[in-house]
Swiss-Prot record:
PANTHER family: PHOSPHOADENOSINE PHOSPHOSULFATE REDUCTASE (PTHR46509:SF1). Binds 1 [4Fe-4S] cluster per subunit. The keyword Secreted does not apply. Its cofactor is [4Fe-4S] cluster. Keywords: Cytoplasm, Iron, Iron-sulfur, Metal-binding, Oxidoreductase. The gene is cysH. Belongs to the PAPS reductase family. CysH subfamily. This is Adenosine 5'-phosphosulfate reductase. The lineage of its organism: Bacteria, Bacillati, Bacillota, Bacilli, Bacillales.
Amino acid sequence: MLTYDTWEEPAITFPEDDSYKGALSVLKWAYGHYGDQLVYACSFGIEGIVLIDLISKVKKDAEIVFLDTGLHFKETYETIEKVKERYPGLNIILKKPSLTLEEQAEAHGDKLWEREPNQCCYIRKILPLREALAGHPAWLSGLRRDQGPSRANTNFLNKDDKFQSIKVCPLIHWTWKDIWRYTSKHELDYNILHDQGYPSIGCEPCTSPAFTAEDLRSGRWNGMAKTECGLHE
């Protein structure tokens, strides 16, 4: 089994010229290789909706983890409920941080995300995902290369030093237009905030409409020297 400890640049190739740009081939390999040990950490943005639909073609009872920070838009929770209705076999887990927002405010001060967003992300996202991935050799992510400069070199299979795991990214060759074409063709429900100028959706206090079409994550952490929550750095 390919794991963090046995990692070598994989001699595995996936076709990129099919209608899925390699995504379905990657998923079939990943679930065939890891089975129930493979976890999808999903934010339920538009890429996540597409990837869930593809996953459902391969493993109808896949485990999907949502990092429930307690700060998400209500529209995000509404999207999760729609996904549950469409794919009743999926095992969707809402993973909460060990600290409630009240406990975090007591320990670190109110609205930590405004003063120390990196620490807030660490408490409410990184630590919970680390717990969720414990004992799992690999996880899925919906990263795409054209989401921004920090993701341009993502591969199908990646050695993930942060979580000491293998990060599998089936959608790396999909463009923003590919995502929306697939969504429309298959009539997938998605977060309505995408129709209101939010191409990338995270926690409500740290998410604004995008400022530029060239960087779909330009609406995240507005005014701060920060473009990632830390999960993919």
